[in-house]
A protein has these predicted regions:
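Non-catalytic structural scaffold of enzyme domains
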Residues: 2-243
Length: 243
């Protein structure tokens, strides 16, 4: 019996981490995870066939999410990382219900905590998809930790298609981002949460358009949360380090 338990723990440690997003944006999370947990295996699902999610109905997002989670569970993952803000905002509870006791990490929780740790003026801006903004998920997550913080959210529905197109430094993307940033900058924010995993790919452009504003990339904080979960669950490296 003890030997079986030891074998099961060993097998569990060798299983991969499942990461999923509506498209290529979640690869920013994968990169951060690989840097923070270099010995872990990762299974990534990017739903490029049905991107963008941010303009779809709640029911559609929940259906697509259930299909993705089922696929990852069939691949015997040991933890799930919701690398899509829209999914985290709309279907996070569904993911956790399907996962059971499995650790589930999401970018909104990590992003909210990072923003609160970063802001000096308690004026935080959030750029996100329309669905994420309408869900009020970031404001709720931030206010649950500090109700005195002012949160200004801006829907940016055109940015995901531009990133998926590869127009990371295109003039059209620059002009579009500039328009989205105007109300946020007018609100005198000092911290800006990139509330979609596609947006970190635009960091050079956004830094140029919003100088002096600290950008919060939730991919980095999500990776740190995964590392803490790995420590608590005593995950072992899934691969041997190169000699």
């Amino acid at each position: 019996m003890v030997l079986d338990k030891v074998n099961n723990m060993s097998n569990n440690k060798q299983r991969p981490i499942g990461v999923f997003d509506s498209g290529v944006g979640g690869l920013t999370n994968v990169r951060a995870l690989m840097e923070r947990l270099p010995m872990e295996n990762i299974v990534y699902f990017g739903d490029t066939a049905r991107v963008p999610y941010g303009v779809k109905s709640r029911a559609t997002i929940e259906t697509f999410t259930a299909q993705i989670v089922e696929f990852l569970l069939q691949n015997d993952v040991k933890a799930l990382v919701i690398a899509c803000n829209t999914i985290a905002a709309v279907a996070g509870q569904k993911v956790r219900a399907m996962a059971g006791n499995m650790p589930v990490l999401d970018v909104i929780t990590a992003g909210a905590e990072a923003a609160l740790a970063t802001t000096r003026t308690n004026h935080i801006g959030v750029m996100a998809t329309s669905t994420t903004v309408n869900s009020n998920a970031y404001a709720r997550a931030i206010h649950s930790r500090n109700p005195d913080v002012r949160v200004q959210s801006q829907a940016c529905p055109l940015l995901v298609p531009l990133v998926e197109e590869g127009w990371l430094d295109h003039e059209v993307t620059r002009l579009t981002a500039r328009e989205y940033l105007k109300p946020l900058l007018a609100d005198d924010i000092d911290t800006l949460v990139l509330g979609c995993t596609h947006y970190p790919l635009l960091k050079p452009l956004l830094k140029a358009e919003a100088p002096g504003i600290t950008l919060v990339d939730s991919a980095l904080t999500t990776a740190e949360a995964a590392a803490q979960a790995a420590l608590q669950a005593a995950w072992s490296p899934a691969r041997k380090a190169p000699e």
